Amino acid sequence: MSSIIQNPIESSYFVEDLSAVGNSQLHSGRSLTYGDRKANIDTRSGGGRRFWSNLNDSGNSFGAVPASSMNLSYGPTKSATISSKDGAMSRSSRYYVSSELKATLPSLDGRRLSKRNAANHASHHRMPDESASYRTRGEYESSSPRVPQKSLRRYYSTRTAQRLDVRRPASRSSRYSKTSDLPPSDPGRFVDDSDLTPHTDFTNRFVDSDFDPDSGVGRSSSPDQMMSRNNNLNINARMTSTSSKPYAKENQQLISSMAPVEQKNSFSTAREQYVAPALSFAEPVETQHNHMPKTTPLRGTSTVMNGSPIGPYSSSSNATGMYGVSKGHSSSTRRPFFSDVGSSQPAEEFVGSSSSHGRQQDSYIADDSDSERSYRRVRDQYLSKPRLSDKNRYSTFSEFPGQGTPSASQSNLRRSNTVRPTSFYYEKLHIKNDNPSFQALPYETTTQERKPVVKPDSIKTVKPEKKKSKGFFKKLMHKISHIFD
């Protein structure tokens, strides 16, 4: 007989025909899947009773699904007369209906079910908790009490009903979330230009909300945009090709607009940008303190407020950085290569204090060649923060103690805390301290060596331990000899 099992809780969009699965398979306890639920077959009752394992708490009152014919009715239909152990009893059942009717009215089921839902479960006087198929019912009587399903609204709400009308499966995880309608994104794919991630996402190496206030707008991984946004150590590696450079070739100077443009209808009262100075190979681009050269994008539309004359930036204010440059269009901004800046004048900005190295030096890396300065930097690092002596330096990073400067083991540390005061002012690096079990001290220790106190009598009295060991060996040999008997 062809019959249909429907998941009663979610009025599932997926209907399975039992005749496809042979009866032998049913009795062998093979589980069927509906949407995302498993229907387990209970072999104790002759394979007749099938229950939803995750709704199990209420004695299967609502979840029990008969093997052969359909549970939930779609109107107060008179069903067949049901025979039970007590005798034949006929009742009008809202719960049973023939599978044909069910197959005819798939469209109604979501809406109707949701309407009748509350009323149905409120009336627990006759919950079909001994519901089994017409055949099986005689053999099987359940002992479980009749308890209404605990909180059915949680499982089947109006929203769920609407969702099922659109024939979307309601999965456990998506049940409460509103975003569940979006297509799931594939975690394995690379971050795309179109992706917008919140700035708290630390996996995104292009966005740092502290230093880059525009990060919320549009995000693009194209190298020249990144160049204008970040100070990247990697920056040389992703410079764009030489052909597209907007600065001057062979003394021909590029200026964004030759005459000041009066702008009658300006949309923004904001401070407008000045035009970039003409660039030639000889003069290096101005640099701010953060090593970002101040290059304005050279665009034809540059505006000058109030007819003020075109000119370079005033050198005094480098605080605001680039004036009118909107980060969105900064793809036109390019940086000169270091090789192009020209060695004719040593570029002061690139080198820092010592101009001797000319342009060979990479301006993005701090100049550590001066030993005095690097020593000072490391020393300051140690002086700046008092280090708590009882804590392992690397405890934040792993469970295991780090392989750092040899320092005391934990037990030693605890002991030596009481022995000597810790001083935070010494420079750990420069004190020669061969004994790893002590903390380095800010001064040379001048305590005289104390020789151990010797009481000559007590030393001679200590001897009898050796006799003990002799007796021990005798006993041991005696035991061993038994093995070889």
Swiss-Prot record:
Keywords noted in UniProt: Cell membrane, Membrane, Phosphoprotein
Region (Required and sufficient for plasma membrane anchoring): 451-485
Annotated stretches, region: Sufficient for interaction with Skb1: 1-200
Keyword Glycoprotein appears in the UniProt entry: no
Subcellular location: Cell membrane
Organism: Schizosaccharomyces pombe (strain 972 / ATCC 24843)
Residues where Phosphoserine is found: S222, S458
Bias-annotated ranges (Polar residues): 171-182, 218-230, 341-363, 394-416
GO terms of biological process kind: lateral cortical node assembly; protein localization to lateral cortical node
Annotated region (Disordered), positions in chain: 117-230, 286-416, 446-466
Basic and acidic residues compositional bias, start-end: 189-198, 371-393, 447-464
Assembly notes: Interacts with Skb1.
Protein name according to UniProt: Skb1 localization factor 1
Signal peptide range: none
Task of the protein: Acts as a membrane anchor for Skb1 in forming plasma membrane microdomains. Promotes mitotic entry by sequestering mitotic inhibitor Skb1 from its regulatory targets Cdr1 and Wee1.
Primary residence: membrane
GO cellular component, one term: lateral cortical node
